Amino acid sequence: IKQLRIYPPENGTCDLIVIYEIEEPEQLSQNGHYLSIDLGLHNLMTCYDSGNGRTFILGRKYLSLERYFHKEIARVQSVWYAQQSERGIKYPKSSKHIRRLYRKKQNAVKDYLHKTTRWIAEYCRKEDIRCVVVGDIRNIRKENDMGHKTNQKLHELPYNKLYIMLEYKLKLYGIQLIKQEESYTSQCSPLSSEVSKRYAEASNRKERGKYITNG
């Protein structure tokens, strides 16, 4: 252990940060075996193993966690604001119960992401996968308007945390992580010579997965 950091109590709890040094493993040489990960809204991670052709989905529980806490927080807020309104308080502060629910939600999501990314790292080590390719969709959220509800869900998804957790866990085993830009991939036809804004705007996409081409 190199360092211990104790942060002052906040909302009744304090943070203890333990910093320790580990020997960084060398990156493994590529063997042509990779795992590709497609990040999504309903299925957080859809994975494909190039070695055995296996496809599996991880992260279905994430939206259930989000829905549960959103519903519970909304219920508690409704009761709290009604009580404060009866007392003549027009703009009440958030209650301890509400703040506790937000912390509980944050911890539950963080724990779930850690467990999911740990499972992927262990799977790659077991199957001798030396490269993981994951879609980088952070810019997609900025460039597209998919409606209020969908936009809200997309912005709440902790993609950046997921990237960081996955990257350092894979790095401990010498496994490379590649982030693949995914802008315009859904608008371009599979027959397009390249994936770009120009081809996306020219694409005659009728519906999801259906294109009309001249080829």
What are these regions (language model features)?
Residues 1-7:
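Well-ordered mid-protein domain cores that form the structural environment of catalytic cofactors
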Residues 8-215:
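Positively charged, helix-rich recognition surfaces that bind polyanionic ligands
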